[in-house]
Amino acid sequence: MPITYKIASEQGRITAFATGITRADDLHGLIRAILADPAFVPGLRALYDARYAEPDITIMQLAEVAGEVRQLLKRGLGRIAIAAESDTTYRVAKTFTVLARAIGIDVDVFREIDDAEAWLSKGA
């Protein structure tokens, strides 16, 4: 799986790292793994670092992923920041944010990791 993650409870953060080609199955696997992780507690915020990844995913699959992310919100996940450098990854992430916001997910995408980190820290 080209997506790994770590939970830093003391920082209130889940950080996921995506590399290579990422597909819907990878994202679904990430969500399932986080949901099953005993370190996942309410109040965490998430950073999805996709700077070194390229997506291979359809809009319909993005909508399905957004729907599954709602399970994380129901368990107490806060806002989600996405860091994306390539134009393709950025466009796909922007599409995801539109779909996710439509169902109540607080998410945004950034080209710079520092901007994503700063946004996550606001109001924390």
Predicted regions and their residues:
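Amphipathic, Lys/Arg-enriched alpha-helical "gate/interface" segment within cytosolic domains
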Residues: 1-124
